[in-house]
Amino acid sequence: VLAEKGMAVHYSDKFQGKKTANGDIFDQNGLTAAHTKFPYGSQVKVTNLANNQSVVVTINDRMRRRNKNIIDVTSRAATELGFIKKGRARVNLELVR
């Protein structure tokens, strides 16, 4: 999968300072995300389809495979994408590298 569309959400503050699946310390101010399949370290361009705002995040965590959302981003990424208040947005994901 090099690109996909679906719903993005942002992490709850309860994860701040906890370890991600790859061992990093989670930081809401970073530009990182969780995905079901993209390899750790992948750079993924996330575009909010409602406003066309984009941000590139690094995958450093995993989501459950049966999750209805396709990506879980930090609060910083959600702010830059313009959906921090709504809590979720329909997005396009594009694997950059």
Which functions belong to the PLM regions below?
Residues V1-R97:
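Secreted/periplasmic proteins
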